[in-house]
């Protein structure tokens, strides 16, 4: 079963890479709670032609911070592609602490940043206060894109953008143009849709909204 699942994920990555055809970068999700599987998927994504990797914190196992460090380092050492860590404790049951994120970004050349879906602004502020420019931050929470941008996020890796791509792009572009008030207004306008997209288990509602 594990090999079948790995092949299924690999084939989806290949499909995306071929469809995109270098028009935009493809960041492939290759995370797993099994280090061997995460390494295999990351290497396959690199062979296929992905431009970067998004590697989620191992779920269910609840590793220590040192265990998480070793897991991500082994994955990163197996490829040359840039890697974004994916910190989403609501789904994995494990939080990648700010100190561990900074340690990984400093120690491992191709670990470049994090998709932060903690929803914990205080924790994110602490992360950026100790990062000293070594962590590229991306929001993983659509309801707080603007607050994350204010802490130094470079953008958002978004669920909302699947159904409202233009609006999601505008939230970020307006902010970066210095039109913070307009960006905030668009952010607040999007909140009901964000909440609706999570009224059931993701991605059920997203798929329905895209039909």
PLM region spans:
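Catalytic alpha/beta core domains of metabolic enzymes, predominantly
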Residues: 77-78, 91-198
């Amino acid at each position: 079963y594990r090999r079948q699942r790995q092949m299924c994920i690999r084939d989806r990555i290949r499909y995306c890479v071929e469809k995109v055809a270098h028009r935009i970068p493809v960041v492939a999700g290759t995370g797993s709670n099994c280090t061997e599987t995460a390494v295999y998927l990351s290497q396959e994504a690199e062979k296929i032609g992905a431009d970067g990797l998004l590697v989620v914190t191992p779920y269910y196992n609840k590793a220590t911070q040192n265990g998480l460090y070793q897991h991500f380092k082994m994955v990163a050492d197996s490829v040359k592609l840039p890697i974004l860590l994916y910190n989403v404790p609501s789904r994995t049951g494990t939080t990648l602490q700010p100190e561990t994120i900074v340690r990984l970004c400093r120690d491992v050349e191709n670990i470049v940043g994090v998709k932060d879906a903690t929803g914990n602004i205080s924790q994110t502020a602490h992360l950026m206060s100790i990062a000293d420019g070594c962590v590229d931050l991306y929001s993983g929470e659509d309801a707080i894109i603007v607050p994350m941008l204010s802490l130094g996020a470079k953008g958002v890796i978004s669920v909302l953008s699947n159904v409202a791509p233009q609006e999601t792009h505008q939230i970020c572009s307006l902010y970066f143009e210095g039109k913070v008030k307009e960006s905030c207004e668009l952010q607040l306008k999007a909140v009901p849709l964000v909440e609706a997209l999570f009224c059931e288990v993701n991605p059920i509602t997203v798929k329905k909204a895209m039909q």
